[in-house]
């Protein structure tokens, strides 16, 4: 009986630490899924704690920005900023806007990068 309780507790604790699938919708109703649907507060907390989810967030943002960059005829928005610069931008955005979604921060980053690329 004790073994069952210990096993159940271990499984429960392990499952509780697995990030849940998240989703969000933009103003136009388009669905977004993954870590980007979480709050900027969660992003900041994850990065400050150097939690395992930190990599999930950063890779989600990298994929979001890269995908939007590849799926356009606009100028390449990633020629002037490296990975660390992108993450620093989102860090700053999320610290200033803890209630916003990570998706919103990533979209604002893309908007900023597009504006910079068009000025060149």
What are these regions (language model features)?
Residues 1-5:
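Positively charged n-region of N-terminal signal peptides that target proteins for export
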Residues 6-16:
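Bacterial N-terminal signal peptides
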Residues 15-18, 120:
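Intrinsically disordered, low-complexity linkers and terminal tails enriched in Pro/Gly
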Residues 20-24:
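Boundary at the C-terminal end of the N-terminal hydrophobic targeting segment
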Residues 26-92:
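Short N-proximal segments of mature Sec-exported proteins
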Residues 98-120:
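C-terminal partner/receptor-binding element of secreted or periplasmic proteins
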